Curated annotation (Swiss-Prot):
GO terms for cellular component: cytosol; keratin filament. This is Keratin-associated protein 9-1. The gene is KRTAP9-1. It holds the Pfam family Keratin_B2_2. It comes from Homo sapiens (Human). It comes from the Eukaryota. The lineage of its organism: Eukaryota, Metazoa, Chordata, Craniata, Vertebrata. Sequence repeats lie at residues 8-12, 13-17, 18-22, 37-41, 42-46, 51-55, 56-60, 61-65, 66-70, 75-79, 80-84, 85-89, 90-94, 95-99, 105-109, 114-117, 118-121, 133-137, 138-142, 143-147, 153-157, 162-166, 167-171, 176-180, 185-189, 190-194, 214-218, 219-223, 229-233, 234-238, 239-243, 244-248. Residues 8-248 are annotated as: 32 X 5 AA repeats of C-C-[CGSVRQH]-[SQTNP]-[PTSI]. The keyword Repeat applies. The keyword Cell membrane does not apply. Interacts with hair keratins. In the hair cortex, hair keratin intermediate filaments are embedded in an interfilamentous matrix, consisting of hair keratin-associated proteins (KRTAP), which are essential for the formation of a rigid and resistant hair shaft through their extensive disulfide bond cross-linking with abundant cysteine residues of hair keratins. The matrix proteins include the high-sulfur and high-glycine-tyrosine keratins. Keywords: Keratin, Repeat.
Amino acid sequence: MTHCCSPCCQPTCCRTTCCRTTCWKPTTVTTCSSTPCCQPSCCVPSCCQPCCHPTCCQNTCCRTTCCQPTCVASCCQPSCCSTPCCQPTCCGSSCCGQTSCGSSCCQPICGSSCCQPCCHPTCYQTICFRTTCCQPTCCQPTCCRNTSCQPTCCGSSCCQPCCHPTCCQTICRSTCCQPSCVTRCCSTPCCQPTCGGSSCCSQTCNESSYCLPCCRPTCCQTTCYRTTCCRPSCCCSPCCVSSCCQPSCC
């Protein structure tokens, strides 16, 4: 018998209805065409396992990771969906790390496996955050809102100590600023890699004013000096000439 509307199964198999090309494999029904296509009434559920129930995922075979985002709770059966379910829309309106779907995602039952990395669900009213947001240890509620960190996230009330997000790519750090940070990013004591290396520079540090390691900018103006330069305690102006301090002066 001819195909009803190739590619699809034989009319006797699919009840005169053309199948979708992304549906069931033909291995379980010998009368189907070679193209992977069959209605659920033709093919047994084991055709494309693991997957969701055909009525949940629009009669198409589901991905091996589980259900489609449009699946409902009845879709995520333990036999067809593996944890986590319906990723990567964990924090949307679909599944959340378990075998059941729901409108609220990051419930306490999901824990840290819900949509890591993100804030703990008990910290942000079941709202998950992006990877560049808060640390899992929780911050102040005013730090993180919606799906991104506010500029205050890396301030004094959250993820201390760190620089302003505009300097450090919104990542809280235990050390200090990135080389691209400006002076206002660093509070005393704070290190400027381009200024003082592993030493902490003063709050008035200007990364364009001197090199590693160097004298204080108030001692030697804005001239870069060599490693055999002046001591941080300052020296008289004759010590700093050309591009290097005289050891005898310091």
